[in-house]
From Swiss-Prot:
Lineage summary: Bacteria, Bacillati, Bacillota, Bacilli, Bacillales
InterPro entries in alphabetical order: CinA, CinA-like_C, CinA_C, CinA_KH, Competence-induced_CinA, MoaB/Mog-like_dom_sf, MoaB/Mog_dom
Any single Pfam family the record assigns to this protein: CinA_KH
Name of the featured protein: Putative competence-damage inducible protein
Family note: Belongs to the CinA family.
Matching SUPFAM superfamilies: CinA-like (SSF142433), Molybdenum cofactor biosynthesis proteins (SSF53218)
Recorded superkingdom: Bacteria
SMART domains (UniProt xref): MoCF_biosynth
Amino acid sequence: MKAEVIAVGSELLLGQIANTNGQFLSQQLAKAGVDVFYHSVVGDNATRLQETLEIASERSELIILTGGLGPTKDDLTKEVVASFLHKELVIDEVALEQIVSFFEKRNLPMTENNRKQALVLKEATIFQNHYGMAPGMATIHQGVTYVLLPGPPREMRPMVTEQVIPFLSSHVGDLQIISRVLRFFGIGESKLETELEDLIDGQSNPTIAPLASEGEVTLRLTVKHHDETQAALLLDETERKIRERVGHYFYGYDETSLMEKLVSCLTKTGLSLASAESLTGGLFGARITNIPGASACFLAAITTYTNDMKQSWLNVPPHVLEQHGAVSPECAIAMAQGVKKLTKADVTISFTGVAGPSPSEGKEPGTVFIGLCFRDDEPEAITLQLSGSREQIRERTLKHGCQQILNRIKRWNERSNDKV
């Protein structure tokens, strides 16, 4: 099913608000196996909306419109669509009752234009609005499905997930549509695509869709099949081929984050973790303790932003700071050793470096050193040169830290299995 999303509202064209609805709809439709080919934004103008509908109806099988269902004169989506499809607008009694009740409960006068929000296309499928007044609706005309949704995200989003997606699924046919997202870190999008070029070029069912964001790359595999079991087998086979080539960078599925994967692995292996932070300013500890179950493995996060605190809290030797500076692999190792001595954790990690925007100790922004102590192994320092804003450098540092620990756990598990 080829889909198109039309956002209606002059405030979108003027940049007064962001079109977050478009992003959300594309995400939800992709999960449902619906291909979105076009996005359009139209102001509150009947003529231009009519022209947009004429173009969309020629090239798309599903047209979703958001916004313009309110009570004012510039809310004209329903009227334009009704005229375009030669359909009558009628009052939806359920919606009207809901609107009347809203005003009565608040002891407010209801103006006549509020009744406009209860108007729907005749014989349309109605999507009740549980968080606002204007209902959504869907109608099929000459093989094209038209879906009209309210503009406010708090009204539109639950309507889509709870009512629209099930409606669309019932109209796709009896095909099972299943998606699986593979998550990778430590490899760029271009390199990943190069490694998988023949698989991506030859994709049909499942389809393979790469996406890069903040140092990570995901692959969304989507399969369509009449049998759910066979669909899963097709996904398994495609995943196997992918992981044979780039499995070293794979860490999880769907919405799993590196932090969540780390907490899961630490908990399963019974390893404890503590952190010493300078560059990241406590972000690592804050993020990991946001994850349910982190208390089973995470002991402490110590933030030492100044050299004095590094010496007094973490016992970083003065000669390390004098000879090498705080932004150095030697300091990173000393910080990791210091927090290990304090907490007795199985795994300790430290972060030091320059987030920017200015250089420090002669080091350029993006210079990062991660210290790592893993059980009784020799401590090590990992050197990174990252790019981006101050916030991006910190975020990417956290992800690299998680990856380093996960890699050490993997090697430790492999060594343990070899001894069995």
